[in-house]
């Protein structure tokens, strides 16, 4: 008995942390000692009236409940009152602070986590009384068909919920008909579409065309890395001109637009402003003249010769396919570029300077520290299995294309990588006088030089999405988004790791020491451009990588119908070793090149416009 009394006394003397239910932040610390349970104050706590003792300060209330063994205390009439009272009051403060730039995204998502978990706890009690809460409006949000990227969508979803919007998140790769039917069935106020890859722009255009065809007039918000106000004005607005389509650049802006749309007068005024902006952009686009003229494709091809007379392509030490399975997280950490991580969270600066920014620096350090905890856990529990695959094949340039072979004699063709060439005339301020195509950095047969062509695909592991969904199911959006952000960094680190291994060991054409900052600054020979990005903006070329490397069979990565990679934390690309190879921006191409490319690919007019329309602008 003495031992139990001592244990109780020790427990009482330990600090008890009282958490404010609305914000989930520590507001008081109480050190309870034996003296707290003696004297007049304690005697008063023997009161039997629930109405009286429930009005005491929270510290006194806790003391009384602890001694009396009371596990329930009602200070508000119903669970719904708790949600719509202190919880929503707290989130209103969060929304206001975020909108005013006084609170940063990681803080908002953490507050949303407390809100979600609190509501999840209260929901069974609310359901028992058949109570339903009010909201500022109902929003259906989705990443469009063919696209798997959803970090930005998830952030918008969380911030919307922080502002008391009911959000129906349909996830990724959602067809237009499912979004529309859900919006109708749920009597939605607003639809929000997200997309990262350029084919998603076509899907958004199709979606708005369907909305018009069906006679629907719900406001539609557009967002994502590949979207812009200019594209919305020129391509999307005409598809939904009689209704409302809004481009929103970030989560804060999305909330502002949604809040305004829920007020009929505000909605009309906002749409008028957007229409004026769109029509101004359209007029400017129609009247614009190119700063430099476009060359014919034949003129553009009369340029870079590769300087093959003075250059001998390095012979790989190893050719064929090389697999990398379960690369240790500890190894990949050395290759991480942290700067893009902060941009995901809306924080300023590059690593490590972001920590010293007067606005957001402290929060940048906190979220970075949280990321280190995630990496530590991944190192220990091995729940992610980063994998990659690369291949090196004999190759030669044929015009703007790279033809690949299975044999050193270059007689057995196994595939062709089709290239696009810059057509805009080079100006005096251009980095190079040449109109580049990536095939320029591969020797043709006439040069007499033997050349090779490399390709790769990497992902952090197909297990990532299961872990993310687990956090979401637990109402923990913060760790879900944090894991996705870390996963993206690991995927890029994996790509950097393979490229380093290729240069120094597998192809073995350079002798270099590991230097992470040097890798970030690309202080090495060779490049790894990706299909779908500025130098090679045509996404269907990923199929060649998948076919030759057997990517899906070997490491589980997949391509969607829009050629987005699954899982989202994935990277693929080509390897070039020529010392003059560089990452250039293709820019606008003209119809003569588009038709020539389509002919080489075996496309009809429809396919040409689908996959090259963005490059043709």
From Swiss-Prot:
Gene3D superfamilies: Cobalamin-binding domain, Cobalamin-dependent Methionine Synthase, domain 2, Homocysteine-binding-like domain, Methionine synthase domain, Vitamin B12-dependent methionine synthase, activation domain. It comes from Haemophilus influenzae (strain ATCC 51907 / DSM 11121 / KW20 / Rd). Keywords: Cobalt, Metal-binding, Repeat, S-adenosyl-L-methionine. Residues 288-617 form the AdoMet activation domain. One of its GO terms (molecular function) is methionine synthase activity. Residues 33-134 form the B12-binding N-terminal domain. The keyword Acetylation does not apply. PANTHER family: METHIONINE SYNTHASE (PTHR45833:SF1). Residues 136-272 form the B12-binding domain. S-adenosyl-L-methionine binds at residues 337, 528, 583-584. InterPro entries: Cbl-bd_cap, Cobalamin-bd, Cobalamin-bd_sf, HCY_dom_sf, Met_Synthase/Corrinoid, Met_synthase_B12-bd, Meth_synthase_dom, VitB12-dep_Met_synth_activ_dom. Methylcob(III)alamin binds at residues 84, 146-150, 194, 198, 251. It comes from the Bacteria. PROSITE patterns: ADOMET_ACTIVATION (PS50974), B12_BINDING (PS51332), B12_BINDING_NTER (PS51337). The keyword Repeat applies. This is Uncharacterized protein HI_1042. Belongs to the vitamin-B12 dependent methionine synthase family.
